[in-house]
Swiss-Prot record:
PANTHER family: TRANSCRIPTIONAL REGULATORY PROTEIN YEBC-RELATED, TRANSLATIONAL ACTIVATOR OF CYTOCHROME C OXIDASE 1. Coiled coil: none annotated. The lineage of its organism: Bacteria, Pseudomonadati, Pseudomonadota, Gammaproteobacteria, Pseudomonadales. GO terms for molecular function: DNA binding. The keyword Secreted does not apply. The keyword Transferase does not apply. GO terms for biological process: regulation of DNA-templated transcription. It is found in: Cytoplasm. InterPro entries: Integrase-like_N, TACO1_YebC-like_2nd/3rd_dom, TACO1_YebC_N, Transcrip_reg_TACO1-like, Transcrip_reg_TACO1-like_dom3, YebC-like. Keywords: Cytoplasm, DNA-binding, Transcription, Transcription regulation. Its main location: cytoplasm. It comes from Pseudomonas savastanoi pv. phaseolicola (strain 1448A / Race 6). One of its GO terms (cellular component) is cytosol. Belongs to the TACO1 family. This is Probable transcriptional regulatory protein PSPPH_3775.
Amino acid sequence: MAGHSKWANIKHRKERQDAKKGKIFTKWIRELTVAARQGGGDPGSNPRLRLALDKALGANMTRDTIDRAVARGVGASDGDDVEELGYEGYGPGGVAIMVETMTDNRNRTAAAVRHAFTKCGGNLGTDGSVAYLFDRKGQISFAAGVDEDALIEAAMEADADDVVTNDDGSIDVFTSFSGFYAVRNALEAAGFKASDAEIVMLPTTSAVLDLETAEKVLKLIDMLEDLDDVQNVYSNAEIPDDVMEQLG
């Protein structure tokens, strides 16, 4: 129930880059649009839209921008049809990588993703080539200082899969994909305010990287995340803390 989240350092690095590059707004506008298109414009009956709404507000997106994105999704305004596509491949050192995209032009997106893999010494694979190495899970994060014992008890009562206490004191609650929203709502009702909540692809095995390979893998991940159509990039890379410190 306690331990170090192996992929937290990569995630935190990515979040800093997202904020720095201003890409986070584009990401959540697309998510709002697709969520509204698939499940309707009422966040009360559309859990995916509610989650996207919370994320957008947390990123300080204006209500007007949010409303326009939702309206575009439910068809109240014209807009290009956006679809969700996934890509799989291997990076340097045999690291498994999954890429989630939202695009209005699948040919453009496929070419851009393939170019990134090729340029950085990786290979874009076929559907299923690395997906079996990942599980789709819910991850609900809480900042350091939360009552650990009470949170663990509430999480177990809500049928969470696991609770992990990280080295910095923050806590991650993991759920099944299907149980994510129920657990999130139960913890919220119990008075626990999450710092983040999302559906993620967690690797079932990890590839521990040395400095040279880590630099190459992170270059590929950065290049993929820089692509306009990319929403999320997941890998099974495990970068030791001392290596991450050298990377800066």
